[in-house]
């Protein structure tokens, strides 16, 4: 072998068979030009590890200025060659490439790197796309109270992506209306409905499952589960039949959103025999279906939910996803399921770099949340969309959750522009400290009625009682015998309505807005600053999704070059959001 060294440039050990003359090989690292965008593209300290082969132009010569290179790299459908020219690094489309051979002739240039095409529909696991009838491995997660609206779900379905309707917190009537609309509007397109764990309202969870089964909702997103429940297992097992090979074929599919290993283990395994026996005894599934369920995981897809808005354990994505992938592999080896569970990532997917990182770590698909609430199709209000558009990464805080208030479970919400988190925490502290409303010191009760309730405790209790008489009368039986339960239900009235005030843009309640949001919202705002997506009125879910996926392709192209030893200046990589027309031109 021969080692070539020139001032400022270190080349690796190059086999003599691939060596080329010093005149052709030598170049000096070129600094980016700070005074103009059309600068040489190489960064300082660039190292070319090894010449891959040789490249010869056809009709187009290599380009070396950053504007031209940016255009080529941004054309993600085009295969590219990175070569060494007499004037430095060049990038070219087309031409002839020869790998692993001696220099074929003087018209050939040293080939430093190659970039194959990478398009948005190539990201993720194609099995996820096939299973759900999608073009892209991209999903919008369910945001409760209809924030994950039917509008979002329809837009996603028509664009070849998967949208999940935010059924949590809604009445059976509202959910039924959404089913009617989406089944009529997305006849041959994919859609998903949320099923949230409701430990304080098990009857409502059962009623939602009954509705989904009766109306033929074939795909649900299960969220906030701490353990499997009989209604959830019933949904999965109902309709099971043996396939041609005897393996179970599920009619009802589940996307499980989890952040804990112990919960993920339950979804990546068959349902427990105890729950299956309970369902068989109740006549809700057949013995044959229960037997088939013993060789079927509880979910088809599992979302590793990192630091997200709403219910979250604030897990870091960079550790959570690999952990879930390893757990899936271990349980797949144990159970030998016919189709392995696919693992996606949610929480922090708000920039091209975030999406690219997820796919690079092995995510089968990505799920977005907070950024969709800021879009015009969300079930939120213009006031909330403006608040979200101003949020930074540090403008989030944890606050008590309405649906699991008594358990001390918290949700991540927006802190900027609202006092909800502080006021909700005060209610939780009073609940923990006192056995009843009457036991709370009078000055404290006055403040709660003035700031949070804006009415007397008994007036709010009357409203709350009327609500549960319709929704779940069994809750009232507990409240009639336990004053602490009664107090909790009134406090949950405030927590529950605070998100509805935000969704409706209630002008007199802005300081009480509960806006579920993760730090990804701040990252998104930083990414779109100075672009057409900076304005909340321009934020459409499909445009946001396509820009994230396209930008991820560009980021992955950059990473591919870096792995081959070629480091280009930042301006060579177009990751800023594009208008729909500009994006269409790039993807031609």
Describe the residue ranges of each PLM region.
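Catalytic or ion-translocation cores adjacent to nucleophile or general acid/base/metal-coordination motifs
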Residues: 173-175, 307, 353-412
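C-terminal catalytic or substrate-handling cores of phosphate/nucleotide-
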Residues: 415-479
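C-terminal domain-closing interface element
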Residues: 200-224, 396-440
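Active-site entrance/lid segments in N-terminal catalytic domains of soluble metabolic enzymes
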Residues: 40-340, 353, 370-372, 404, ...
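Non-transmembrane, aqueous-exposed alpha-helical and coiled segments at domain scale
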Residues: 318-339, 351-359, 376, 389-393, ...
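Glycine-rich beta-strand-to-loop/alpha-helix junction loops that act as flexible
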Residues: 342-350, 368
């Amino acid at each position: 072998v021969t080692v070539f060294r020139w001032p400022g440039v270190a080349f690796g050990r190059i086999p003599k068979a691939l060596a080329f003359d010093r005149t052709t090989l030598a170049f000096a690292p070129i600094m980016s030009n700070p005074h103009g965008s059309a600068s040489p593209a190489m960064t300082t300290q660039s190292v070319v590890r090894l010449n891959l082969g040789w490249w010869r132009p056809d009709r187009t010569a290599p380009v070396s200025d950053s504007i031209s290179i940016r255009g080529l790299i941004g054309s993600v459908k085009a295969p590219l060659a990175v070569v060494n020219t007499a004037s430095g690094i060049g990038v070219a489309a087309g031409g002839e490439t020869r790998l692993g051979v001696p220099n074929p002739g003087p018209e050939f240039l040293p080939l430093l790197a190659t970039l194959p095409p990478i398009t948005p529909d190539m990201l993720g696991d194609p099995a996820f796309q096939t299973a759900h009838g999608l073009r892209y491995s991209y999903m919008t997660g369910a945001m409760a109270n209809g924030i994950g609206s039917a509008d979002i779900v329809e837009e996603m379905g028509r664009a070849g992506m998967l949208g999940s309707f935010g059924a949590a917190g809604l009445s059976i009537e509202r959910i039924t209306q959404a089913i009617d609309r989406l089944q009529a509007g997305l006849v041959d397109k994919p859609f998903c409905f949320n099923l949230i764990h409701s430990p304080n309202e098990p009857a409502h969870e059962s009623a939602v499952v009954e509705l989904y089964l009766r109306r033929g909702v074939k795909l649900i997103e299960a969220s906030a589960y701490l353990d499997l429940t009989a209604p959830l297992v019933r949904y999965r097992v109902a309709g099971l039949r043996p396939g041609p090979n005897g393996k179970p074929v599920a009619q009802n599919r589940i996307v499980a959103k989890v952040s804990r290993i112990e919960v993920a283990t339950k979804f990546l395994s068959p349902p427990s025999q105890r729950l299956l026996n309970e369902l068989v005894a109740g006549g809700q599934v057949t013995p044959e279906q229960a037997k088939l369920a013993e060789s079927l995981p509880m979910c088809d897809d599992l979302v590793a939910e990192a630091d997200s808005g709403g219910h979250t354990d604030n897990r870091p994505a960079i550790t959570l996803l690999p952990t879930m992938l390893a757990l899936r592999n271990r349980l797949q080896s144990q159970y030998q399921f016919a189709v392995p569970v696919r693992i996606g990532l949610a929480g922090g997917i708000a920039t091209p770099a975030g999406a690219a990182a997820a796919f690079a770590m092995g995510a089968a698909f990505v799920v977005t949340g907070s950024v969709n609430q800021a879009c015009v199709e969300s079930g939120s209000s213009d006031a909330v969309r403006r608040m979200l558009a101003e949020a930074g990464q540090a403008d989030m805080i944890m606050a008590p959750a309405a649906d699991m208030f008594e358990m001390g479970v918290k949700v991540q919400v927006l802190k900027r522009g609202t006092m909800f988190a502080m006021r909700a925490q005060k209610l939780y502290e009073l609940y923990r400290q006192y056995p009843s409303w009457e036991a709370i010191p009078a000055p404290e009760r006055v403040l709660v009625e003035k700031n949070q309730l804006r009415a007397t405790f008994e007036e709010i209790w009357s409203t709350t009682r009327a609500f549960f008489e319709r929704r779940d009368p069994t809750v009232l039986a507990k409240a009639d015998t336990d004053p602490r339960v009664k107090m909790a239900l009134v406090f949950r009235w405030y927590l529950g309505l605070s998100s509805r005030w935000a969704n409706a843009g209630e002008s007199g309640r802005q300081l009480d807005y509960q806006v579920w949001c993760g730090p990804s919202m701040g990252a998104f705002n930083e990414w779109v600053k100075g672009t057409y997506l900076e304005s909340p009125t321009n934020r459409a879910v499909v445009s946001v999704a396509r820009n994230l996926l396209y930008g991820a392709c560009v980021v992955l192209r950059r990473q591919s070059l870096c792995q081959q030893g070629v480091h280009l200046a930042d301006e060579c990589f177009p990751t800023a959001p594009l208008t729909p027309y500009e994006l269409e031109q790039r993807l031609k």
